[in-house]
Amino acid sequence: GKVLAKVHKSPISRIRTRQADIRNIEALRAQGYKKGSEKKYVGNFSLIHRTTDPQTVYVKSKIDRDDIIDIQDFDVVQYLYGIDRMNLNEELATAIVLGDGREDGDEGKIAQDKIRPIWLDDELYTIHADVDIAGMKTSLQGTNTGANFGDNYVYAEAVIQSLLYAREKYKGSGTPDFYCTPHLLNVMLLARDLNGRRIYDNVNELRAALNVGEIITAEQFEGKVRTTKDQKKKKLLGLMYNMADYSLGSTKGGEITHFTDFDIDFNQQKSLLETRCSGANTRVMSAIALEEDVTDTGVGG
């Protein structure tokens, strides 16, 4: 629910973004002028643009009229509508953040070029940062081989360090939020120092350490693994992003609409809930995906 509430709603179903690429800023610097000399042109810069077209996403269901009549405890039709609406909202939110997870050839797949998932987006838009847990353990222990830092503490420190270092490249707007699994949040909250004292007494202290506006847990993050172009497997740990930078576009008629019909041949009440929209991150380098390299562990296939 928070994802759909936080994204930017656009009244245009086709999302177009165009931005200047000035990463070669040194070549664009202003120059001092010496009397009598020729003034030189500064370097050129390129424009980054992409267009995202809409796709229809729907939930279709049916119920026998006999069941509607027999169930008297509650309004079963309204109850099923509530479930359909919840499923549609969850599917849209999952497609926006992670992708819908279906295989490319699946007939029901939400195309990743129609609703672009933040996690799987191009490196220009999403910074994919590795969390080096083994390296953090070595760094914390140092030359004191007798020191025994708890796994939770090492894990928490590795996540925080990777996130803060990656944030040096962050170009998003406002204060971002951190999305992760409930387990990762618990691991970081349970981190203890060598004396057994909790590092973070509550979520607010952890939120301050991560320098984010809110920590939002989502079970859908559990077990998500992607394969990179060089065939490495990366397990998603968390995602830092300000959903206001993501545009969800839909024109009049494309908003979430509910249709009902009664089939007299089969004596069934039928329901269709659908929307036609597009979605895309509109700011470059505005998302940070924290990942763990699981290439050699066999995770994810």
Placement of each model-derived feature along the sequence:
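Assembly/oligomerization interface modules of large self-assembling protein complexes
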Residues: 1-60
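Short, basic/hydrophobic alpha-helical segments
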Residues: 161-172
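Sequence/fold signature of self-assembling virion shell proteins
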Residues: 48, 82, 130, 134-143, ...
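Solvent-exposed loop and beta-edge segments used for protein-protein assembly and interaction
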Residues: 53-55, 172, 265
